[in-house]
Amino acid sequence: MTAANVPGSSIGVDALPIRENLRGKSAYGAPQLTVPVQLNTNENPHPPTKALVDDVAESVREAARELHRYPDRDAVALRTDLAAYLVRQTGVPVTVDNVWAANGSNEILQQLLQAFGGPGRSAMGFVPSYSMHPIIADGTETEWLPIFRRADFALDVDAATAAITERRPDVVFVTSPNNPTGHSVGIAELRRVLDAAPGIVIVDEAYAEFSDAPSALTLIDEYPSKLVVSRTMSKAFAFAGGRLGYLAAAPAFIEALLLVRLPYHLSVVTQAAARAALRHANETLASVHALATERVRVSKALDDTGFRVIPSDANFILFGEFTDSAHAWRAYLDRGVLIRDVGIPGYLRATVGLASENDAFIVASDEIAATELTSSGDRG
């Protein structure tokens, strides 16, 4: 069916009475293309094991018997399992009362800004960072205050605390490891941010399992009225299709989110599948070590070729410096390799994939380096 045959297609978004702060904005979205090598969305490339697939299938089958009933609106069993996982992974003795879950960490962040942001309030982030933070701020009518990182993309804590003191944001985002640069933020640095912040600090730990840095969870009892740690099962857990995000914080934060969450927001199917995935955490997370090893190998190969490689604690690598990053992105795509243009001039981001995928990426990079690097980036 052509556009002319689609009912209502004669108008565009600009013809709608949309909020002014959304007018002219672009929606979030990474290209979804069918190519031989997909390294653009930071998924775990290792598929679920047969045991996990079977467990999910059986768990969903059992849950389907109750599809005529609403799910547990507070997802108590799932939150209990998530708390147990966090205890094992971080050593911090959190309980079900410290944990909240939603449909991906983006919904977690949205609920937090619904409760603690909104009209007349502001949120600060240290850019470049996760591009959904300002989008969620716009969606909740929270003023977005971007503060730039250092030239090496690390967090400048002195500049961060000075900006917090000057602007006094209601919400501060700290992403560790940071997407798209890969840097982790140490506990001492987080303390300085928390001490300076007048409102809440959301530490986005979507890629925490890939990093050896201590989790911010260790600070919850020290900063109970300020600290929220958000996480996801989409990355290391290889559960991106399951859409499950969660947070850990003082119980009072969970009580606050109950005021803004939609009723029965997590389906019985999502809860059952996520609990099954958590039962297989050890086997799934075994791939993290392999991906970290591949990250080192790929980073060295890029460096040897002449790229500037930003050190990463995550499952992706930011690298450059390209004369034209958009043109370089297309050059990779022409070679069957899909990576991500994250909007940083001169740089692209590649997910660490399977060894064979990384080999194809390295071959493409060797070819592209000859024509796409700046003279400062080409050190070969």
Curated annotation (Swiss-Prot):
InterPro entries: Aminotrans_II_pyridoxalP_BS, Aminotransferase_I/II_large, HisP_aminotrans, PyrdxlP-dep_Trfase, PyrdxlP-dep_Trfase_major, PyrdxlP-dep_Trfase_small
Pfam families: Aminotran_1_2 (PF00155)
GO biological process, one term: L-histidine biosynthetic process
CDD domains named in the record: AAT_like
Keywords annotated in UniProt: Amino-acid biosynthesis, Aminotransferase, Histidine biosynthesis, Pyridoxal phosphate, Transferase
Chain positions found as N6-(pyridoxal phosphate)lysine: 235
Record SUPFAM superfamilies: PLP-dependent transferases (SSF53383)
Entry cofactors: pyridoxal 5'-phosphate
Catalyses which reaction(s): L-histidinol phosphate + 2-oxoglutarate = 3-(imidazol-4-yl)-2-oxopropyl phosphate + L-glutamate
Enzyme Commission code: 2.6.1.9
Top enzyme class: transferase
GO MF term (any one): histidinol-phosphate transaminase activity
Pathway: Amino-acid biosynthesis; L-histidine biosynthesis; L-histidine from 5-phospho-alpha-D-ribose 1-diphosphate: step 7/9
Subunit structure, as described in the record: Homodimer.
Family: Belongs to the class-II pyridoxal-phosphate-dependent aminotransferase family. Histidinol-phosphate aminotransferase subfamily.
NCBIfam families: hisC, PRK03317.1
Name the record gives this protein: Histidinol-phosphate aminotransferase
Record organism: Rhodococcus jostii (strain RHA1)
Gene designation per UniProt: hisC
